[in-house]
Amino acid sequence: MKLNVFISSQKDGIMSNEKKFFPTLSSAERNLLYENTLKRFFAKKNIDSEKVIILPNKNKEIKSRVVTPSIKKVKEAILLLKDSSNGLCVAAEMDDYPVIIASAQTETGHSVVAIAIGTLENLNNNLLHEIVESLIKETNAAPFEMTFYISACPNKDKLEVAPSLLTNNYIWKDTTIKRKKKTFLDIRYAIFNTLIKEIVDPNNIYFDNTDSTTNNKYFSNLGNKPGKNLVCVVYNEEEI
């Protein structure tokens, strides 16, 4: 089975039913619009939207869960997708924080991928360590055998943060820049540096260096482009 990763664009529509994006619509109207937006988007990839598990960017429980066909909603921050998942698709919500995708193989060659969203709170609460530990548990692979992909996100001169949120020195040491009484975070460096501490091979860490605040493919609150994209992961027999 081939691991496929694909990302919605602004042209595909806002991947959310939140009122803040559609203030004039009723709850029923927002839900209907969201359902139809998902169906249209996934139909382009020949994926049944009923087989899609949404990973909300509000999830804060730093635990992992293996996705199965019976799962409809999740509260965990990390979802695990196996190559035997029979067409299930995990779609992670993305606005200003990167989606993190990590993969590892078992001794018999089967693949497992972890999907999570690198919000400040989740990273501060050792999300990356839990991703590594979850893949070790599922595959018995060593951290240096794992591969990480980090999606587009704001550049280091765009992501303004409150220093009070960065309480975990293991994650945030030497990752901020002060300019005109404002603090900006180099979130890519924070992720890279933390993964190195977790004994991940630096040659196996891949970043999409696109600045999501300026690139027109992506929604971004920081870039005054309110909305959400979906970063989607699925195992299929063919490349999508």
Give the predicted meaning of each segment.
Residues 1-5:
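Extreme N-terminal starter segment of soluble prokaryotic enzymes
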